[in-house]
Every structure is written in C-alpha cells, then in structure tokens.
C-alpha cells in the first residue's frame, strides 16, 4: 500500500492508473462504517484510494478542530489490512496553499445547505464542497463512495457532480450499524455506557416510524409525534420529513422521503436517518 503525503506524489501515482479508480474520502478515525465503504470500493474497482484529511474549513467557530481524533497509524493499518492500494494523507498546507482571505470562496447550493445541519453548522457545507472538489480534481476517480448517514452531505455532493458536469459516479452506501442498531460514527466513542443506552432511542424512533409507514401511515405530523415520543429523553435538534430536495413534506412520498434526526446525548451530537 502506498502512503501519499503530497499532491505531487498523488499525481505521479494517479497518472499510471488506467483502470477504474474508487475513492473513499474520510477525515480518519476510521470505523466499520468507513470499512464498509472501502470494501465496496475494493469490490467494484481495480484500484481504491482512501483520503485521510481533517478538513479545517468545514469546522465552525464553536467546533473544536484541534480536538478531532487523528489516529493516523491505526487508520493506515486498517487500510493496509483491507487491501487499499493507496492512502492520500496530506498536511493542511498541501490542500490549502493560501491563507483563508486569499482563497476562492465556495458555496454549497442554498436550497440544500441552509436547513437542518446547515442551520446549526453555518458554513459547514461550504467547507465540504471546497475540500471534496479539490479531492475530486486530484484523485479523478471513476466512483466516489459516501455514506447515507450523512444524508444532506450526500445530496449536496450528488448535486455538485451533476451541476459541474463531473464524470464521477457517486455511490451512496447504506448506513452501517452496531449490533445494538446505533449508527456507526466517529462520535460514538464520546458516549459513556449510560449515554450509549440513551442513544438507542434514535434508531428505535426511526424503526418505529418505518413500521408505521409500512402499515400504511402517511401523515408526517403523526409520524413525527410518534418519533418525538420515543426521543423524549434526548435533546432533539430536529426530526424532519423531507423530500430529496430537502423540502418539508406533509405526506410520505414513496422513494422520495427522508426522515432526518439530530439529537444530543450528553455533550455528543448524533445524526441518523431513514430513506423511505
């Protein structure tokens, strides 16, 4: 496995790859959710490149960029074990050669980025768009793999690729869950045993909503009330029913409905969702 730390090294490596290239962009602290994305890329492509880069531009003023976990050696060991061909792990100066005030400004499409996570984390998706575009430009992948757990991010990336006419297939990947059904996340390590049990209300609420929909309930207000009842012990940021343009729904639309939840358990903020 190659470990590439500079843009020059990545370009030199990439120019010799003639068959399909799968790309899994990450911020490191890899878990089984990331592993499922990597394994799918390995299965579907001749070469797989994983990026490990904690992107400063997607952190808000009140978010601690310096505290984000960076277990690089552990991440590299996992990638090598899985059979990844190359890991791109650049320093900030490689990805951002200019100071903030000298950089080009990137703006995620407002209709997809202003609500939900965008309303809580101002500028977050602008930073995501910025770094993903740079990575796409450098890696030039055949396919790029994104988890459905970050649903809003996935919709923005799909829109980005279509709007900018990029010849990249975006491969949405199912949400990976632990044995207790909690969605896998790098943030789960911050939960103590009590908080972990409390957090299980999130997948339970989504599962109960799904069961109600399967039985024929289509009124979003009733389904929301059902979910909030299960989430009552948590600090809920939102539980919303939207279509794939993130427009609010009053009635479930088959194949075009997202149920999105964000809630705080102690000091840890968790996301989960249901694609109907």
Curated annotation (Swiss-Prot):
Gene3D superfamilies in UniProt: HUPs, Pantoate-beta-alanine ligase, C-terminal domain
Keywords: ATP-binding, Cytoplasm, Ligase, Nucleotide-binding, Pantothenate biosynthesis
GO molecular-function terms, A-Z: ATP binding; pantoate-beta-alanine ligase activity
Job of this protein: Catalyzes the condensation of pantoate with beta-alanine in an ATP-dependent reaction via a pantoyl-adenylate intermediate.
Originating species: Helicobacter pylori (strain HPAG1)
Pathway(s) of this molecule: Cofactor biosynthesis; (R)-pantothenate biosynthesis; (R)-pantothenate from (R)-pantoate and beta-alanine: step 1/1
Highest rank taxon of the organism: Bacteria
Pfam families to which the protein is assigned, alphabetical: Pantoate_ligase
Record protein name field: Pantothenate synthetase
Top EC class for this record: ligase
Active-site residues per Swiss-Prot or TrEMBL entry: 34
Location in the cell: Cytoplasm
UniProt-listed HAMAP family: PanC
Family: Belongs to the pantothenate synthetase family.
Quaternary data: Homodimer.
């Amino acid at each position: 496995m190659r470990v590439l730390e500079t843009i020059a090294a990545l370009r030199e490596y990439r120019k010799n790859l003639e068959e399909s290239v799968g790309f899994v962009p990450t911020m490191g602290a890899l878990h089984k959710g990331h592993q499922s994305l990597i394994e799918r890329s390995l299965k579907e492509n001749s070469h797989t490149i994983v990026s490990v880069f904690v992107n400063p531009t997607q952190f808000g003023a009140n978010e601690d960029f310096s505290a984000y976990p960076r277990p690089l050696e552990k991440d590299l060991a996992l990638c090598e074990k899985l059979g990844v061909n190359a890991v791109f792990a650049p320093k900030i100066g490689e990805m951002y050669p200019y100071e903030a005030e000298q950089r080009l400004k990137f703006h995620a499409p407002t209709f997809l980025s202003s609500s939900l996570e965008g309303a809580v984390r101002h500028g977050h998706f602008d930073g995501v768009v910025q770094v993903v575009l740079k990575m796409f430009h450098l890696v030039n992948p055949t396919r790029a793999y994104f988890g459905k757990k970050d649903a809003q991010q996935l919709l923005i990336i799909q829109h980005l690729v279509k709007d900018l006419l990029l010849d990249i297939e975006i491969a949405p990947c199912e949400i990976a869950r632990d044995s207790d059904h909690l969605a896998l996340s790098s943030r789960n390590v911050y939960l103590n045993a009590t908080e972990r049990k409390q957090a299980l209300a999130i997948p339970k609420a989504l599962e109960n909503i799904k069961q109600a929909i399967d039985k024929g309930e289509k009124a979003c207000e009733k389904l929301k009330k059902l979910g909030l009842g299960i989430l009552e012990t948590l600090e809920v940021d939102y539980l919303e029913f939207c279509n794939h343009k993130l427009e609010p729904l009053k009635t479930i639309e088959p194949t075009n409905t997202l149920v999105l939840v964000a809630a705080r358990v102690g000091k840890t903020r968790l996301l989960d969702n249901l694609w109907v």
